Amino acid sequence: MKTPLLKPLLITSLPVFASVFTAASIVWQLGEPKLAMPFVLGIIAGGLVDLDNRLTGRLKNIIATVALFTLSSLTAQSTLGTGLPFILAMTLMTFGFTILGAVGLKYRTFAFGALAVATYTTLTYTPETYWLTNPFMILCGTVLYSTAIIIFQIILPHRPVQESVANAYDALGGYLEAKADFFDPDEAAWIGNRHIDLAMSNTGVITAFNQCRSALFYRLRGKHRHPRTAKMLRYYFAAQDIHERISSAHVDYQEMSEKFKNTDIIFRIHRLLEMQGQACRNTAQALRASKDYVYSKRLGRAIEGCRQSLRLLSDSNDNPDIRHLRRLLDNLGSVDQQFRQLQHNGLQAENDRMGDTRIAALETGSLKNTWQAIRPQLNLESGVFRHAVRLSLVVAAACTIVEALNLNLGYWILLTALFVCQPNYTATKSRVRQRIAGTVLGVIVGSLVPYFTPSVETKLWIVIASTTLFFMTRTYKYSFSTFFITIQALTSLSLAGLDVYAAMPVRIIDTIIGASLAWAAVSYLWPDWKYLTLERTAALAVCSNGAYLEKITERLKSGETGDDVEYRATRRRAHEHTAALSSTLSDMSSEPAKFADSLQPGFTLLKTGYALTGYISALGAYRSEMHEECSPDFTAQFHLAAEHTAHIFQHLPETEPDDFQTALDTLRGELDTLRTHSSGTQSHILLQQLQLIARQLEPYYRAYRQIPHRQPQNAA
């Protein structure tokens, strides 16, 4: 069935709205408004751990969620008020659940939800309430939300996957538009800055692709493959192919802009890339509307105009760089062909082979592999372990403060610290500001609620609206979500018969204390800046690019042209590790005083590394053409030089300067020999591409050696 033309945020919030509305109706019918708080908190907990999956996968997730929530809620409830046993129980649960996140996204999500439920249990405690009431109501809320999400999945089974694929095309559209800036001849002198901008944009593409891959992975695990899921898989593969071709670099952009700045070809390519970016956005819009993408005839005329301009340019100019422009246009033509195929659903036959439609596993996948995933993380070099220890100490401190001072409603401190303390210093600092701002504003607005909503019914409507708005805003604006959840919390306290005005200053003070604990923890307990290992991230990036080049060389040698799961996984790792380098530098840039000596070589590494990934991707686009014109002598020598280049990249982090120079001299000799065997157009193109790749070796190695306190290590 067709998905209604509703905003994605509204669609994803419908299960929450339905759940809270049902809970409020039940509470109103029973005449027990004090049950609203634990009931709604259970719904919120269920929403926090909700992960898209096929129907049977969701049912398994619900069972695991209820089991974990039962354990954490009963543990918190049974030890609450006992002093040291409660502090120990909460601390151990925090460490255990957080370190479990090392297994994968699913376990990390469930573990955080279990910690949230334990905290919710402490928040809803009152001495006069039977001890099982609040844990039971929290679990009822979780089950109610789970039931609602199952119903909505039956009604709109493919909406989450469509939204994930649409987000991937939106991100890809932004990436294409960023790539278009490379073809602005008036900005040729500042192309180095464009590389950094493009790398940052690429991080968003990789994130969107990974979310899309995750959604498809869980939908494809069953034996039956729904036609709509298969269609989304084809769209995903098309996006991957477009990304590889657009991220490829066939020429030195600065040199090309200088040489062709007075011709119209540069401006035409710039316009074509912008139009292809818009085509990606149009694809995203079509997916969200459950319609087929309609290919724009203007796009076809634009690519034909580029080709005509190139023909006229080549007729009047014997510049050898013309052939590189021709290869660039051939690549853009392949992107255009992908859009044409999307309209006609022409990828069906190409991608329905089983070997082409597998997706690499996302995580270890089962509990039996849990220890194998956790064991390597049990050291301070692991960000997961540092976060687990840090968060455990924060929880212990918060619980100790509340228990020692016997603070009324004091567990808001624990809740704030738990949600604000992130593995990353920059993210935590941002959340501290947003949490405090959202809470203060929420308290101000919440103080007006009793004047305008004296009845139980209107207060329940406030709870419904604020909870729904919390979920609508939590993924993109944390201060807004904090604002809405503060209003919800104060209204729930009012429904429970507590003095809201007495709770308001407590809420603000507790938020400040909890946020301060989180900030102090990430600032002084194994702070991130001591472990922001630019060296390791750069090593992983260059090694994964070497593996990517090696995989392409194998394909060129064997003549294979398909993108099987192994090739896609290798390509994805190269892009992910390059994106990780971008993220690391972004974090370091927020603390320039601490990383002053590392930032300059870091940005050189990013610019060079991103160019390297682009040149390797371009070589990957030639996989089907190696044997068309190349002589056997050229082919053999090309494989030798390419394999040697890949080997140098893969072992670059551990190579000493003298050994690196020897290897580089040997490679240059191999490339000189290869040049003597280069005769046809195709061999010239392949030679030039390999030379562009090899050209990145020296600047990358030089920048890598300039990283302060560098120690030899093997990142491979």
Regions found by a protein language model. Name each.
Residues 1-115, 120-148, 152-156, 319-484, ...:
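Alpha-helical transmembrane segments and their membrane-interface boundaries
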